[in-house]
């Protein structure tokens, strides 16, 4: 347990930030899974493209604000782009 008031405050702040960071990362994970699920379900190309745009937008935002490392955001965007470009819906 913290011995000083300032340490108690830092503990509270860290807990709030941790919760916010976890929520943002969980949201990103959901967007990435959604795109993969659409690809696996053989969805229309337009649906996959809209999921791609949402995921890339979230990756950009989290990378700029340093919730994830910028290189990780870039790497994930490249992987998603590769998946999107190679995707052709089966009739």
Swiss-Prot record:
Single annotated GO MF: small ribosomal subunit rRNA binding
Which InterPro entries does the entry link to? Ribosomal_bS20, Ribosomal_bS20_sf
Kindly indicate whether the keyword Manganese belongs to this entry: no
Task: Name the GO terms of the biological process aspect.
Answer: translation
* Record field: compositional bias (Basic and acidic residues): 1-21
Going by the UniProt record, its keywords in alphabetical order are: Ribonucleoprotein, Ribosomal protein, RNA-binding, rRNA-binding
**A Pfam family reported for this protein in Swiss-Prot or TrEMBL:** Ribosomal_S20p
Q: Where is this region: Disordered?
A: 1-24
List the record's Gene Ontology CC terms alphabetically. Answer: cytosol; small ribosomal subunit
Checking HAMAP family in the record gives: Ribosomal_bS20 (MF_00500)
The family this protein is said to belong to: Belongs to the bacterial ribosomal protein bS20 family.
Q: What does this protein do?
A: Binds directly to 16S ribosomal RNA.
Q: What is this protein called?
A: Small ribosomal subunit protein bS20
Organism of origin is Chlorobaculum parvum (strain DSM 263 / NCIMB 8327)
- Species lineage, top-down? Bacteria, Pseudomonadati, Chlorobiota, Chlorobiia, Chlorobiales
